[in-house]
């Protein structure tokens, strides 16, 4: 992208931000045998934006569809390896080997082998893990069900002894089921079967109820809770389960129970009622668990060794595959020659890059042992080229602020040149406090001094934005310190830094009164606001007047800059119509009204006059013939005002009427063959067309042009008033920032200091710090930033900036390694 070609080093000439780079449409004809290497070298150069010459074809119909599918399959394997390494906690190692030293065919074979091996290891490991989880559940069943059968056996033995002792022939309700055969007639004996297993605890009550209903109560079920969670063999997830034992009678009941167990996801395990066999099974299960644990551990070690091997080459393979895929995607944008022996490509490149592109084509032909070299030629076109600004790490953020509004049209004047200074300055006008500015500066210096380390780390969304705009914030903090010194505010506290105050108090009550009680005893305070103003009753009216007038002066100056930029645009594109019927009347209208107001403000400051400027400006329109009286600031002011008013009124039809008729006349002359000679000069014809707003089309809609000019005129006339008023936000936010800072200092810090209590002091200091950081350094910074952004986008840029271009996006490998699929 544009950001990667900054400064004046390397292949690029010195940076120029005012106009985008001159671009040219180039055509390259490349032999098939050197096409791959040619595109690779151009990707390393990163100065060609290829056009898709096969847009009518689907991706599957293109020449290199098979190669892209092959790269996609290798990329899938790479993603699989990355996922496996992430699960195992293995970090890919940074490699210093050159990716060009490896062959794609070798990589493909190696990836195939490694994937097959890893898949086999995972499958074996999953099978062993499933067996291990089943044995863990089986062991729990043996323990819990064994306890139940043992207690039942003990209870049966005790009851049998009691029956024999007391000679009681009746069956008890609690007679043990297992010993029933000893206490009943063998001819009347009923054989009971049983099933054991585990059921999820949240389903256990429903499971028991369904079993009871399905068998009409002809079952006996006993459940035991397992304290710790167990891993389910089927899902591989931890779950809380109960061990159950169900006794039933008959095969029909058994089939019902089996179906219900299957529906509830209950895992069943075999169990013997013989205590000796239970002990033998427990021993066997414990032994197998120990063996499986050892086997699983060995399998995981083997898997980790394999993943470590993959991690050593992972970054190298990943970068190689991404580059190859990007190369084939670009080759698919080139059209196949009718002979099918060469590829033809077209694309945009900066004019200065022609030599570097030709060198890359020559190197590719030599390195690929091609018998035929590539052909490079410049094409003539009327198509709008992309916009390319070479920026560095300092100017990139300012360019992004402008691009967020709209990318500059080809070779249109770039607002970023002045935004580098005006944006932080307007921010500082609203944020003027040199204490807060120092805090911002320290935070930004941390980001700047550690930028190499931080640029390689993944930061959060907010931190990423702050880091990306670190040089913008740096400039904002410097200007805030400057305006803070002018306002003489350090966390709202004034300091006589440059000299003592020019005033002294007439008496003791002077500080409680207005400035009438002050006597000027020394020279005027040399820089900024005299500290004596702070704390007096007239502080707010004085600062209000100062900042409001200052906001108007700044606003009118910046709007004039915008209109002057439109003059340089018109001059660059050789559009005399825009100079005489847009720039000139706009300058006259704005300065005859608000430029005149700015001059009155300066005269009032210099003379100390008590004239009411509101009255002067209002009655300049309402009663222009009335005498000014005490509001007169200079001789012949009435005549000057009448002249300015007349010029302002004349400038409105001057903007509206001539331009559509002149454009119509130019169109008619062009179609009579009077202007065809200019088409030989590609650059000029391109420039005229880009500035003409589409007036050179076959059909000239006069009504459409006239309505467009009418809207533009109305917008400028009304905008001159609303935009000037909009700059008063500088005054409002500056006042709000100052008052908030004063409130936090007086009502939090000083109030806490008034108590003779250390705890209250600490609380007061903490509240002051958090309020200052949270409200003034975060919220107020964001607020002032957004308002400065609005003033640039709306009030400044709409005077000259069209912003309807598109960004130069060259084919480059610079960002390939960081892209996500």
Curated annotation (Swiss-Prot):
Membrane-crossing ranges are 423-443, 471-491, 550-570, 583-603, 642-662, 758-778
Just give the chief location class. Answer: membrane
Bilayer topology term: Multi-pass membrane protein
Q: Which GO terms describe its molecular function?
A: diphosphate hydrolysis-driven proton transmembrane transporter activity; proton-transporting ATPase activity, rotational mechanism
Q: Where is this chain's protein located in or outside the cell?
A: Vacuole membrane
- Which residue windows are coiled coil? 98-145
Oligomer status and interactors: V-ATPase is a heteromultimeric enzyme composed of a peripheral catalytic V1 complex (components A to H) attached to an integral membrane V0 proton pore complex (components: a, c, c'', d and e).
Q: Which family does it belong to?
A: Belongs to the V-ATPase 116 kDa subunit family.
Q: Any idea what this protein is called?
A: V-type proton ATPase subunit a2
Supply the source organism for this entry.
Arabidopsis thaliana
The gene is: VHA-a2
């Amino acid at each position: 992208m544009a950001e990667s070609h900054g400064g004046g080093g390397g292949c690029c000439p010195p940076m120029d931000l005012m106009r985008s780079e001159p671009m040219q449409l180039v055509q390259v004809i490349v032999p098939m045998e050197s096409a791959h290497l040619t595109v690779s070298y151009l990707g390393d150069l990163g100065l060609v934006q290829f056009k898709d010459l096969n847009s009518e074809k689907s991706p599957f119909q293109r020449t290199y569809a098979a190669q892209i599918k092959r790269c996609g399959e290798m990329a899938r394997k790479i993603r699989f390896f990355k996922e496996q390494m992430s699960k195992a906690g293995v970090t890919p190692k940074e490699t210093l080997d050159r990716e060009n030293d490896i062959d794609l065919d070798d990589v493909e074979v190696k990836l195939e082998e490694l994937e097959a091996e890893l898949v086999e290891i995972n499958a074996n490991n999953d099978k062993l893990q499933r067996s291990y989880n089943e044995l863990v559940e089986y062991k729990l069943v043996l323990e819990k069900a064994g306890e139940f059968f043992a207690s039942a056996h003990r209870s049966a033995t005790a009851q049998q002894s009691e029956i024999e002792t007391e000679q009681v022939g009746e069956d008890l309700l609690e007679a043990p089921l297992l010993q029933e055969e000893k206490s009943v007639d063998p001819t009347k004996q009923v054989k009971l079967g049983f099933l054991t297993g585990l059921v999820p605890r949240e389903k256990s009550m429903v499971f028991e109820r369904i079993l009871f209903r399905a068998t009409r109560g002809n079952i006996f079920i006993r459940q035991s809770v397992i304290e710790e969670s167990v891993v389910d063999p089927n899902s591989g997830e931890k779950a809380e389960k109960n061990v159950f034992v169900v006794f039933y009678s008959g095969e029909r009941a058994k089939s019902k129970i089996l179906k219900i167990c299957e529906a509830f996801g209950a895992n069943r395990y075999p169990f013997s009622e013989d205590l000796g066999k239970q002990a033998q099974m427990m021993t066997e299960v414990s032994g197998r668990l120990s063996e499986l644990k050892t086997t699983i551990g060995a399998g995981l070690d083997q898997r980790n060794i394999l993943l470590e091997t993959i991690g050593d080459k992972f970054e190298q393979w990943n970068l190689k595959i991404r580059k190859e895929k990007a190369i084939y995607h670009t080759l698919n944008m080139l059209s196949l020659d009718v002979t099918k022996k060469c590829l033809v490509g077209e694309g945009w490149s900066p004019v200065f890059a022609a030599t570097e592109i030709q060198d890359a084509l020559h190197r590719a032909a030599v390195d690929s042992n091609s018998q035929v070299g590539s052909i490079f030629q410049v094409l003539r076109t009327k198509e709008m080229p992309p916009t390319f600004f070479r920026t560095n790490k300092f100017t990139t953020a300012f360019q992004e602020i402008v691009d967020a509004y709209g990318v500059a049209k080809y070779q249109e004047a770039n607002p970023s040149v002045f935004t580098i200074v005006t944006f932080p300055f307007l921010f500082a006008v609203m944020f003027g406090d040199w204490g807060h500015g120092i805090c911002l500066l320290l935070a930004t210096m941390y980001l700047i001094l550690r930028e190499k380390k931080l640029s390689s780390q993944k930061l959060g969304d907010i931190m990423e934005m702050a880091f990306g705009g670190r040089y913008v914030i740096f400039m904002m903090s410097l200007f805030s310190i400057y305006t803070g010194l002018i306002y003489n505010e350090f966390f709202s506290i004034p300091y006589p830094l440059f000299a003592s105050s020019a005033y002294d108090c007439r008496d003791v009550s002077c500080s409680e009164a207005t400035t009438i009680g002050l006597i000027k005893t020394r020279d005027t305070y040399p820089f900024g606001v005299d500290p004596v103003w702070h704390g007096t009753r007239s502080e707010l009216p004085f600062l209000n007047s100062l900042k409001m007038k200052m906001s108007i002066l700044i606003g009118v100056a910046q709007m004039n800059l915008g209109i002057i930029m439109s003059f340089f645009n018109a001059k660059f594109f050789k559009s005399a119509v825009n100079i005489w019927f847009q720039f000139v009347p706009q300058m006259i209208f704005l300065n005859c009204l608000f430029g005149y107001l700015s001059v009155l403000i300066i005269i009032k400051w210099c003379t100390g006059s008590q004239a009411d400027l509101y009255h002067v400006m209002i009655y300049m329109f309402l009663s222009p013939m009335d005498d000014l009286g005490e509001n007169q600031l200079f001789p012949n002011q009435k005549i000057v005002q009448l002249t300015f008013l007349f010029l302002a009124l004349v400038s409105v039809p001057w903007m509206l009427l001539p331009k559509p008729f002149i454009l119509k006349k130019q169109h008619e002359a062009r179609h009579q063959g009077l202007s065809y000679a200019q088409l030989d000069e590609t650059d000029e014809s391109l420039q005229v067309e880009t500035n003409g707003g589409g007036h050179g089309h076959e059909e000239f809609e006069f009504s459409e042009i006239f309505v467009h000019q009418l809207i533009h005129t109305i917008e400028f006339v009304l905008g001159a008033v609303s935009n000037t008023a909009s700059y008063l936000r500088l005054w409002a936010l500056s006042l709000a920032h100052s008052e908030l800072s004063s409130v936090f200092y007086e009502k939090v810090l000083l109030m806490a200091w008034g108590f003779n209590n250390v705890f209250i002091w600490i609380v007061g200091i903490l509240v002051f710090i958090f309020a200052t950081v949270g409200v003034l350094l975060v919220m107020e910074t964001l607020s002032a930033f957004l308002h400065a952004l609005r003033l640039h986008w709306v009030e400044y840029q709409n005077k000259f900036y069209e912003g309807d271009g598109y960004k130069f996006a060259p084919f480059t490998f610079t960002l390939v390694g960081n892209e996500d699929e």
